[in-house]
Amino acid sequence: MNKAEKEKPCINQCCDQIPCVHGGTCTESCEDAKNKFNCTCAVGYYGRFCQKRRATSCKEQLRKNKGSKSGVYQLFDPATMTMYEVFCDAVSEKGFIWTLIESFSLRNNHEFEDKAFYKDYPKNQEAFTWGKFRLSLPRMTATANRSTHLRATCNFNTEELKYRDYLRAKLNDIDVMRLNFDGCKEYEFISIRGYNCSNCTAHFVQRDHWHAHTDSVWGPKMGCQFTSQSTGAVKSPNGEDNFGWYQTVNRVHRCTSSDDSTTQWWLGVRRH
């Protein structure tokens, strides 16, 4: 093939049949007899004809790719037609698939302490980091709409799941995406500094300018069933905060044992 033939535009009419779907762009090719066109796919789609859609949730990601393990994945947001990063956990608790909606270090608490979950405060959705991460409100809400449970963990990035300093509840009992509340709520399990309670009521608070958390001093005074965590709690200045807010901290609580300690909040669904 001479130079003139190489520079001649390729026209084989393969793109006339519009083989690329979901907004994909077709380019004709004359260099390979077996591959006469190429599809450049729109964001969120892939495959020979752009016929496959990227996963939009952790559950879908793990279902589409049976070999997928817990880790950071790129998910497709159909509302904005963009990709974003999130940590999916399908291993730590048998029967559950969890989506991380927030993670922050005690050092960065000042950026999260006044952010209720029903407020929009996205952080590092395109470049995941355990020390400062949160999904946007629309993405958290979409995740909540397909979830059944809520949990909070400490230092998951360095220690994985430990049931000391941990909470789990049904979203029907603690609707963290809407709840403006200070009082007793039902938990499936809650543990603070080694004290724990199963299928009981315990303190939960989230206000317009207070991050969701529990208080080991004031909570037991509200008539909740879980009261043993008051033993050894830091009382001054305002009562020990656990899993967020952190105006008064206890170094025995794993989420606040050092400035590099991290707190995670997750939304989850049972695996079927």
Regions found by a protein language model. Name each.
Residues M1-H272:
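Mature extracellular or lumenal effector domains of secreted proteins
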